[in-house]
Amino acid sequence: MLLPSFPVTGVATALLLRNAVHASQPGSSVQKARAYDRFSSRPTRDHAPRVQSSNTSTYRFWNDKTKPHLVESLPDVHFDLGEMYSGSINITSHRNESRSLFYIFQPKIGEPSDDLTIYLNGGPGCSSEQAFFQENGRFTWQPGTYAPVINQYSWVNLTNMLWVDQPVGTGYSVGTPTATNEAEVAADFLEFFSKFQDLYGIKNFRIFVSGESYAGRYVPYISSAMLDKNDTTHFNLSGKPAHPLHHLAPTNAVCTGALLYDACIGQWDWVQAELPAYPFVQQHASLFNFNETFMTSLATTYEECGYQAYFDEYFTFPASGIQPPKYMNYSECDIYNAIYNEAFSPNPCFNPYRVIDECPLLWDVLGFPTDLAYEPAPTTYFNRADVKRALHAPQNIEWELCSTDPVLVGGDGVSGPEQVGDDSPNPTEGSLPRVIEATNRVLIANGDWDYLIITNGTLLAIQNMTWHGQLGFAAAPATPIDIRMPDLQWAGVFDAQEGYGDLDGPQGVMGVQHYERGLMWAETFQAGHKQAQDQGRVSYRHLQWLLGEVDSL
């Protein structure tokens, strides 16, 4: 997540918003068996690296055209990658300058699938290699760990996966940024996606669009542009609801849809950050550990600047009415940045993406795991020449996790609702309702440890959105998300320690869900800005719902 619109002070805060977005005996064999029975599609549990055949004759998408894109191995990844492709695809040039978007494509493991799930990171300008390498790809290399390992909760266990560096100016993409709005971003993406499908011979697939953080703007606009094409051969996002409008309910029919994590969907700086900031600190008081004097000043600011009254009036179920527009207040009422700056006093390693974190900063192969860069450090993984060669990436690109230059250039990169050069209206004002109404299968989820995009702020944005003729949710979310899948990622660690072998059981209640009129809401416990990284089992369930494999979370 990037969104560098807040004025902040000091070296540490200069990087603000850079990367951007129970059973009674859970270890018993009976409980494990029951949990396994609940999942018809689940990761395969093994403790040694899984190895797929390197014989390309078994690869579904390998042909003479895709052969140059095949990834045979990656540095420091000491197991067979299976079928995997990456590279650049050209899009329309601008002023005689070539432009291209970079992608990584991992086909589904096991039984073939005609589902294709796109995943986009946010920023604007943050590379989707982040999600590929640390969130939902086939393997993962987490901060502070020695080497990459198989990701037991990888989304490639369920669907073909496509990660894309976009818009132009992001990651390994090539060209000078020209987009001033989401329509232009979507046009470039659809051109890329059409060429990608032609390259791999993909037709008549169900398409799912997902992403996190600022991709809360990308995903609805790209999805809406796909719907505009009215072309189910290449852009089958609309699906066919199995129920009449007045009986809408989740269904495993042919519906497709979209998934948004910790997403910028409303007026982010005010509704999803500034307004809910103080209640967030109250909820997590022991983590922030502010002194009594500072907490008293926050309470005074929250009331005197009108935040309390606004929140009380509009954070209601059902919605009390259309919320009047508000914008970031940089005066003495700037409560969000006051909290952000003060947080570094009790916790010098404060991480707004995951407020549970403390010092030391863990070395991250992607460069920095928080707002603070880790220095000195080795070359970032995706900036290594050998990694670029393996991925068929441009050698002359200086890869950055999040671009330091604008990738959206409206008003010289500072116009639009979020002041980042994106002139399009907020998704809640049109594109997001349109996708919900067309698919009846959209999931919006927020992690409870995320200070960048706060859970109740996202809910407040939903309460200001009209879809299927009604404003917001009629009832407050209250249904628990009970994860019965046993632990798969760390089971080997438990099993290797005497006396710990039965502790890798189901998680139990890991969040709250609510479904109305085609929209599923999920609050995820013990997760920050990157839910798939923090809570792989919960994220896996989210994807199962999106694909229609389960009716609830």
Swiss-Prot record:
Name by which UniProt lists this protein: Serine-type carboxypeptidase acuI
UniProt keyword terms in alphabetical order: Carboxypeptidase, Glycoprotein, Hydrolase, Protease, Signal
Species assigned in the record: Aspergillus aculeatus (strain ATCC 16872 / CBS 172.66 / WB 5094)
Glycosylation sites: 55, 90, 96, 157, 230, 236, 291, 329, 456, 464
Family: Belongs to the peptidase S10 family.
Biased composition (Basic and acidic residues): 34-49
Lineage: Eukaryota, Fungi, Dikarya, Ascomycota, Pezizomycotina
Endoplasmic reticulum as UniProt keyword: no
Pfam families: Peptidase_S10
Organism superkingdom: Eukaryota
InterPro entries: AB_hydrolase_fold, Peptidase_S10, Ser_caboxypep_ser_AS
Gene that encodes the chain: acuI
